[in-house]
Each structure stands twice: as C-alpha cells, then as structure tokens.
C-alpha cells in the first residue's frame, strides 16, 4: 500500500472528516417538531416521519399532537411509552417503512428524560427516526511509541456482512450501549465479543466523551454520544476475531493511520474518535489550522437530554413520578435452579425428574442415591451402567437399559430382561450412550435429569460428561442436567440471570467454569469472591475454589457457563 501523501498530522484535513459525521448545521428541516416526554424534548420528528406516524392505530388515544409545536406519547410510565412505540415500529418493520426492517437488531436503546432518568426504550433499528440520542463506547488500543517503533494502533476492518459500513476500518473495539447495560460493562463485553480479550475496568483508561450530530439524507437528525477509552498494551496482547463482526485486525503505525484517515477508510464516527485520540496524545497540536474547530465539533452541545448511567443494571424507583425506573432488559431471561432439592426433605413431589446411571461406580452417599431412585419418575441405565447398578444392589429395577451394549455383560442383560426391564439396543456410533438415554427420557416428557457419573479416572470421560451439559442445552432450553459425583453437583447456567438455591451448601466450595468459550460475567452475589464486569476464560480468570456464603447465589452471564459446587453429607 502506498504511503500517505501527508507528512504530519498537521496536514490532515480534519474538517472533511468531521463533515462526514458531524453534518448538522443547526437548522432543522422546516416542519420538524420536538418529540417530548414530561414537557422536555427528547428527540425531533421530521415531517416525513410525522406524516406516517399520525396514521398509526389508536394515534389519537396514544399520542398528544400539537401541529407545528410538538408530539408526545400519551403515557405516564416507562413501560407504556416503550410498548406504544414498539407497536408502531413493529408495524413499520412489517411494511419495511423507511427501510427499518433491513436495520432491525432486536436490541433496545435507552432514551432519557430531563431528569436524566430513562423515559422509554426503543428498538435500535428505528431509534434514529425520532432524533433520539444514541450512546456507545469506543476504545483505542495502542502500543506506545518506543525508540524502535512509532506509536501503533490496533485497527479492525468491519466484516463485509455488517448491516452498516461493511469493509470500513473501525476503532479498536466499539459498540452501542444497550438498554440496561452500563458503560464499563459494555466496553468489557465488546472486548470479549469483538476482540476475544479479557479486559477489566482496572486496565481501561476513561478519556471522557465525544458528541456530534449527523443530518441524515432524509433530513432527520441523529445526535450521538460516545464514551471514549484508551488501552495501552504491549506486543504480547493481540486481538483475535471472535464474533464475526470483524474481518481482521491490523497493527498500524501512526503514519499508516493518518494515511487511512486521509483516504476516509474509517467509518465516519470512528474517524472522529481518532481525531480526539490524536489531540489528547499531542499528535494534533494547537498549531494545526483546524485545532479549535475540531475541538468544538467533537464536543457538540446536544439538543436532547443525556442520561446518567448507573453502576449496575437497574435504577431504583424512588418516587411516583412519570419518569419511572428501568426494568430489567426484556430479553434478559431469569432462571431458577435447585440442584440439591430432589434429595432434601423439602422436595416438591410435583417435580418430575429422571435418574441416569452411566458406566461408573455409584459413589454418591447411599441414602442420597436411594432417595433419588425412589423419587425419580423414570430410571435409566446407560449400557454398562446396568452392570454398576447390579453390583451395587441387584434388587433395584431400572425402567430402561439403553445403549449399543459394548459394555453391558450378557449376564446383566439377561438378569434385567428376566426382571421385565425394557432393553433398548441402539447401535448408532454417532451418538453417545448418554444421548441415546436422553432421547428415551424426553419421550416421557421429562426435562430434569440427575446423572451419576464419576468425574475421576479418565480425563476424556470427564470432559465428555461436561460436553453432555452443552449438548442437552443445545437441544432445548428447558433441559436441566445435573452431574452427580461423590460430593459434588455440576450443571450448566444459561445466558441471563441465574438464581441457584444453595441453602444446604453455605460454606462449601463452588466454581464457575467457562468451558470451551469466554464468558462475560456481569455480576454475581452470594459468593466469598464475587465477580463483576469480568471475562472468565481458560488462560485467564476462572473462578475455582470459591465459597457459597448465601442461601441463594445469583450469577448473571452472557453465555453458557458450568456451575459446580460441593454437596453436604
């Protein structure tokens, strides 16, 4: 690639770069009116959008419209405002009005009111139609200059399949702040998803914000605010493609970055963030002819309220004002787990579960095993698991013996056949005995399975058992599989908020194991060493040898993660 025709940052035409992103000159299209909430403008609606909006179902009931002055949703709560606007956008999506079906993300952005509290949440694919403020995070990851090398910046190229700005250069790591997420949490999550890097809040350097206002071709304005971070690294830190949004990463020296800026190779708002970086690092200095103008335009006053982001994921409802609290993100599922309840006294007799014996010695406490066996709705032996049961107590009768029978002895097979047990031969070599048994159990309408499987001995068997947790989850989100060993129970936590009943496990060891993938842990509670805004992954942070301190442990994650804990004798 040819070198830049400019020899220093002083020659960079910042104004041209800014015009691509900060293109609003302060004059609204005639007929544009404020979109209000509680008497304050939170956005702006152009005549083109207004013409379609007033045709919405129940418009006169759901909206307050004063022609030439303002429009406002006729609702006093966050939830009702969000619901009214969601129905409008869903209708427009169905008809691809304004092309929003092509930009639909199934992700919400938060819109803030004059009190800096959320007043509604809106689909990311349509927020721009109402002139709402969007917020995001941008981080420049760079290797500082040395005697041998100039300053170098990690620059990704956007995937050719991206909905917006495909194949353009981007900031090192960036992303929009979804409804309910925090600034730092979003930044850490984006590092994990886009660059496959474990970054903590201790490493990131907050560098303020940039703000700008874009005038779209159809004349609606798009105000944006980006929280800016720096991350200086050494040569050993290398970002890697992870989520498909990035085609590749390049480590570019400063002169190459200037060259790409000159060519307008960067997505426009990323170029603006880089201008901010160059100013903060003294690369663009007051001697640059557009220095003051650049400073002003990357910190534009915004015509709409800017929200106050809390540390956590929710806001307390402290009054009965119209601007109510933010509920949990609608797409964030909540899961309740009680791994030990099936053998305790407070067992719910309506809870149906299966017991599955794999080909490992039965090493859990005898009273626990017999309680589970008695309470189970169905009892299944996987191949050689029948040998183990017969050796343990030949009087116990399983409902099924299932497998390809490469481990089942002829004597055991004949013994249980004589007892009237269902013997199911499945020769398929592409499925494990666990999978074969799981199919039988699901045919009985049972989702919860307690699997007796030794995790000692062969490592490949232990890893295979953990793989069954992920396999079962891939079949159905209703599946609950608990692996039982001598004094331990392990299961798979799903993305979202998981509440684990640990009232019989307080003081015992536990762990969170990110098997096969990195997992962003938003927050935990009820542990001796809680985690917040961290990436867990092998080769990095793994929360092993933790301790249960409360009757309920809560774990919020963005991906599947193995939960394991000791059980009491």
Curated annotation (Swiss-Prot):
It is found in: Cytoplasm. GO terms for molecular function: 8-oxo-dGDP phosphatase activity; ATP binding; kinase activity; thiamine binding; thiamine diphosphokinase activity. It comes from the Eukaryota. One of its GO terms (cellular component) is cytosol. Residues 136-276 form the Nudix hydrolase domain. Keywords: ATP-binding, Cytoplasm, Kinase, Nucleotide-binding, Thiamine pyrophosphate, Transferase. The keyword Glycosyltransferase does not apply. Pfam families: DUF4743 (PF15916), NUDIX (PF00293), TPK_B1_binding (PF04265), TPK_catalytic (PF04263). GO terms for biological process: thiamine biosynthetic process; thiamine diphosphate biosynthetic process; thiamine metabolic process; thiamine salvage. Optimum pH is 9.0. SUPFAM superfamilies: Nudix, Thiamin pyrophosphokinase, catalytic domain, Thiamin pyrophosphokinase, substrate-binding domain. InterPro entries: DUF4743, NUDIX_hydrolase-like_dom_sf, NUDIX_hydrolase_dom, Thi_PPkinase, Thiamin_PyroPKinase_B1-bd, TPK_B1-bd_sf, TPK_catalytic, TPK_catalytic_sf. Its EC number is 2.7.6.2. It catalyses: thiamine + ATP = thiamine diphosphate + AMP + H(+). Involved in the regulation of thiamine metabolism, phosphate metabolism, mating and cell growth. This is Thiamine pyrophosphokinase. The gene is tnr3.
